[in-house]
């Protein structure tokens, strides 16, 4: 039997506000345990929550970017459950009236473009965390994270492979960091993924029983967890068993999922409207202001890069992976006047060098103006592509040097003396009679071999196009 995997994602996006969603306590990461736990997070008697306006503004931003419906009346609900890191005994969330509904997000997997529908995004507070290490067998409670504002973004179950799920998660991660509503730091828990996975026979309309894998904090773990869980469910069904609805944990060391608890449904949490919070009403004026302040989105910018700078759609997608990358490209392309060549160098040599050194673009020793200067020298014929790579390496090692100084110091000037190049061509032709005969017999590959010999003789300083033209003229 052929099986189909069905995946929906619930992604917790931690909003990068300075204070918490219902109190003025700091959201700064890495403080001493409970340093940022206010009377609200500690649930002391008589304290009341006060809504953080910035949370609503950031939620609207995401809704607009997802081309979603934004509900202008928002009600908060209590999600009741007992856990030590939740002193109130309930989490404030949104059940029936989420701030964002019916959005969509485009993903690219290989050559395929697919739109995933976003069911909803709702505002809620994060819980604290239990600490088990270094307490001699006891468990401590750290409430620093409690009350941190979250947007839980829920997709439709429209992904059919781990690759599609990873592409969706990456697309949302890119979008929330682009909008500057989340820092995207997965290691610190700013972007956490829960994956709902089920399987069904290919062609069956009805969904299988889903299991939810909680708190996946890397794209690699997301892919591994989904693949393992899908295979595990298929094995259960093929052995004649039934998949039980459950909440799962992923063990990255073993690369497998395991049951944490049997899954609860919404009614198990006894949701009801929070009596301490009035409905949040978003005015038409607030909506207009939010629309006016929206930045150019990645898809729009990518289309503009194709139109204005002549780059391919593929390159445009890479260049708009982050706002920093897009800004770097636009600065370098404008300064050099060479959009396509700039894109090639950014997505090629520069990306490879950053990856090798484990560096961010912001820390690159080759700034946008320096890359523009290099690209300009390639465009005007001063540097061949081979010499340009040597110049790039020197620029990386010598961040203060100008391109002119690099060319002078390392002797990278491309040969412009036609007579000198012609003499080299004559010598190579005289010493490679066999290749000459092969070319005259119609073997185009022989021409490349002859050009290669001339480039070797010139130590890479001759212009390959000029060399090729000279050879063809002499052998015509």
Swiss-Prot record:
Example GO molecular function: asparaginyl-tRNA synthase (glutamine-hydrolyzing) activity
Catalytic activity: L-glutamyl-tRNA(Gln) + L-glutamine + ATP + H2O = L-glutaminyl-tRNA(Gln) + L-glutamate + ADP + phosphate + H(+); L-aspartyl-tRNA(Asn) + L-glutamine + ATP + H2O = L-asparaginyl-tRNA(Asn) + L-glutamate + ADP + phosphate + 2 H(+)
Family to which the UniProt record says this protein belongs: Belongs to the GatB/GatE family. GatB subfamily.
KW Ion transport (keyword) present: no
EC number: 6.3.5.-
Protein name: Aspartyl/glutamyl-tRNA(Asn/Gln) amidotransferase subunit B
InterPro entries, sorted: Asn/Gln-tRNA_amidoTrfase_suB/E, Asn/Gln-tRNA_Trfase_suB/E_cat, Asn/Gln_amidotransferase, Asn/Gln_tRNA_amidoTrase-B-like, GatB, GatB_C_1, GatB_Yqey_C_2, Gln-tRNA_amidoTrfase_suB_CS
Keywords assigned: ATP-binding, Ligase, Nucleotide-binding, Protein biosynthesis
NCBIfam families according to UniProt: gatB, PRK05477.1-2, PRK05477.1-4, PRK05477.1-5
HAMAP family: GatB
Keyword Transmembrane: no
Organism: Neisseria meningitidis serogroup B (strain ATCC BAA-335 / MC58)
Subunit structure: Heterotrimer of A, B and C subunits.
PROSITE patterns assigned to the protein according to its UniProt record, in alphabetical order: GATB
Domain of life per record: Bacteria
């Amino acid at each position: 039997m052929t099986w189909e995997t069905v995946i929906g994602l619930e992604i917790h996006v931690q909003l990068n506000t300075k204070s918490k969603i219902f109190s003025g306590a700091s959201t700064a990461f890495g403080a001493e345990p409970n340093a940022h736990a206010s009377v609200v997070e500690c649930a002391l008697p008589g304290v009341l929550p006060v809504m953080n306006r910035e949370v609503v503004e950031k939620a609207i931003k995401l809704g607009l970017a997802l081309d979603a419906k934004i509900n202008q009346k928002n009600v908060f609900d209590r999600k009741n459950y007992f856990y030590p890191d939740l002193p109130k005994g309930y989490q404030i969330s949104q059940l029936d009236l989420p701030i964002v509904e019916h959005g969509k997000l485009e993903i690219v997997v290989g050559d395929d473009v697919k739109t995933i529908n976003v069911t909803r995004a709702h505002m809620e507070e994060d819980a604290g965390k239990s600490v088990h290490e270094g307490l001699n067998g006891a468990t401590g409670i750290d409430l620093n994270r409690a009350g941190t504002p979250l947007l839980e973004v829920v997709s439709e179950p429209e992904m059919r492979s781990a690759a599609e799920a990873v592409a969706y998660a990456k697309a949302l991660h890119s979008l929330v960091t682009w909008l500057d509503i989340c820092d995207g730091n997965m290691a610190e828990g700013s972007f956490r993924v829960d994956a709902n996975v089920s399987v069904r026979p290919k062609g069956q309309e009805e969904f299988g029983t889903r299991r939810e894998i909680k708190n996946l904090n890397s794209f690699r773990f997301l892919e591994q967890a989904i693949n393992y869980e899908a295979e595990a469910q298929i094995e259960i069904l093929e052995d004649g068993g039934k998949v039980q609805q459950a909440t799962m944990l992923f063990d990255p060391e073993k690369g497998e999922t395991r049951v944490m608890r049997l899954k609860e449904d919404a009614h198990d949490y006894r949701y009801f409207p929070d009596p301490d919070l009035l409905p949040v009403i978003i005015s038409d004026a607030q909506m207009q202001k939010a629309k006016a302040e929206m930045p150019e989105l990645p898809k729009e910018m990518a289309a503009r890069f194709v139109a204005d700078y002549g780059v391919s759609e593929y390159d445009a997608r890479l260049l708009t992976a982050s706002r920093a990358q897009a800004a770097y490209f636009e600065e370098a392309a404008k300064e050099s006047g060479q959009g396509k060549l700039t894109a090639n160098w950014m997505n090629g040599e520069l990306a490879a060098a950053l990856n090798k050194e484990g560096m961010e673009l912001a820390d690159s020793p080759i700034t946008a103006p320096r890359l523009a200067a290099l690209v300009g020298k390639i465009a005007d014929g001063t540097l061949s592509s081979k010499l340009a790579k040597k110049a790039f390496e020197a620029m990386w090692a010598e961040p203060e040097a100008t391109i002119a100084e690099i060319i002078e110091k390392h002797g990278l000037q491309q040969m412009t003396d036609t007579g000198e190049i012609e003499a080299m061509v004559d010598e190579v032709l005289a010493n490679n009679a066999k290749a000459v005969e092969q070319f005259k017999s119609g073997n185009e590959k022989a021409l490349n071999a002859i050009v290669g010999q001339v480039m070797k003789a010139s130590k890479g300083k001759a212009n390959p196009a000029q060399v090729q033209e000279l050879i063809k003229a002499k052998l015509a």
